[in-house]
Amino acid sequence: MTDIPESLKPFVTKKVIHSTWAGTFLCKPQAIFQPRNVEEIQELIKQARLHGKTIMTVGSGHSPSDLTMTTEWLCNLDKFNHVLLEEPYYAPKSPTDDTPEIKFVDLTVEAGTRIFELNEYLKRNNLAIQNLGSISDQSIAGLISTGTHGSTQYHGLVSQQVVSVKFLNSAGELITCSSVDKPEYFRAILLSLGKIGIITHVTLRTCPKYTIKSKQEIINFETLLNNWDNLWLESEFIRIWWFPYTNKCVLWRANKSTDPLSDPRPSWYGTKLGRFFYESLLWVSVHLFPRLTPFVEKFVFGQQYGEVETLGKGDIAVQNSVEGLNMDCLFSQFVNEWSSPLNSGPEILTELKKIITDASQTGDFFVHAPIEVRCSNVTYSDEPFTDDKNQKSLYPSQEWLSNRSKTSAGPIPGNNLRPYLDNSPKLPYSKDGKITNDQLTLFINATMYRPFGTNVETHKWFQLFEDVMSKAGGKPHWAKNFIGLTQDEKYDKQQDLKTQLEFGGKPFYTMLGFKPVMQDWFGKDLVAFNKVRKETDPDGVFLSGKVWAERNGILLD
């Protein structure tokens, strides 16, 4: 503590280790800080600049790569987690009703607020987040900084719900940006990977509380391919879990509802005994008898879902939005997720099935299930809203809002700007609102479990998975365990590998990154991102984790 500036000691923690939630990487920063207000964050930035330190800002640590690893200063905003302002937006008064309907509420929160904390606040106030990913453990800043998404034909990245953001630059100045005010900063901060500044406040467009009515069906793999063109457009929300060794999938589709709550069917591995038994079987198949893996999947699938195709029947449930959209991610895991155009899905899945089948027959490698298959509508007009006088606005038009009810499908967006580092394919935006598969992005998530926190070999499977996705025009999710490509001659592979191993990584899940293709992938958007980065951080205070950023071509000279 002797080398910590006096002004920072009131909010330095006793914690000495930072690790990912999955336990895949860990580091020992020089100090871990938990500021409680903007002034303390400003002081942290000031002292970092004066002492030549870098700052890594972290939340829940759910990114399983070395993205957040540092040997310098680390900032956690868990104590900076208050709801500050509610701004309700009403429909016009009806001649027969003196109580106007609330269409949405813009909620301003401190950036360290965890999503589960926000969900609890919203529930108490009869509100809800419009679209969620699979978990609610992240902070609101972390949620938007890495490109989190759900699974729906109508919604894009979760950052689509963000109206405005405040952040501190390396001079400690508080900057406000939105689709109307400093839109170039807004597009950078909406997927910043922590390299633009420290987010302090987020204004999120929330909606009246709603429930989710879902139908869960068991279908054969061939049924999925045969119905591919229609499945994605039949409901507001959709998720598919593919279990390759059973040749079956779980198809989950849902819409907003006003029906009374009705619990989903009991979960076998949702019980303590079922969960422990499943993880034990995984441990045995990973470390002792890999060829048992297909039999473990078949057994667990039968216990959890049965073995009969139920297309058209299925299990019905009505849940609150959070319970309906979140899911149980089970155990510590490696996760490799890529996006591609939805229309390439059948070809991708057919090729992946052949790879998995061939590998299991030779014993070369085995995969874990499920492989998650999702979609999002990540298309943008790249323009702000306009009001009745055709002036730029943060709000959709009254005419558009007047046609919406509490159960209307799709979002009331906070913005319609594409983040510079959005790694989904650029697909055509439809101004008339009609959605087709041509506009939808496919997300495929390959998961390998780490039973009881132990490691499993991933490189063979993940490399083939990435080859297939890359060939289909895909790109990786920034926060996941992707491998990447062989680098150019300037890349010091041994030094990079050494750095990853020093952070607790293992040779069989280290990353090569995507520097060779980044400029081809992002072009002028990457240039624009770096222009903003250099303006907001000329001193390099936020270049913590620089090795990861350079490995993936995020930084331009």
Swiss-Prot record:
This entry carries the following GO cellular component terms, namely:
mitochondrion; plasma membrane
**Keyword terms:** FAD, Flavoprotein, Oxidoreductase, Virulence
Q: In which pathway does it act?
A: Cofactor biosynthesis; D-erythroascorbate biosynthesis; dehydro-D-arabinono-1,4-lactone from D-arabinose: step 2/2
Enzyme Commission number(s) from the entry = 1.1.3.37, 1.1.3.8, 1.3.3.12
How does gene deletion manifest?
Abolishes D-arabinono-1,4-lactone oxidase activity and impairs the production of D-erythroascorbic acid. Leads to increased sensitivity towards oxidative stress, defective hyphal growth and attenuated virulence.
Q: In terms of domain of life, where is this protein from?
A: Eukaryota
Provide the function of this protein: D-arabinono-1,4-lactone oxidase that catalyzes the final step of biosynthesis of D-erythroascorbic acid, an important antioxidant and one of the virulence factors enhancing the pathogenicity. Is also able to oxidize L-galactono-1,4-lactone, L-xylono-1,4-lactone and L-gulono-1,4-lactone.
Name under which the protein is recorded: D-arabinono-1,4-lactone oxidase
Say which species the protein is native to.
Candida albicans (strain SC5314 / ATCC MYA-2876)
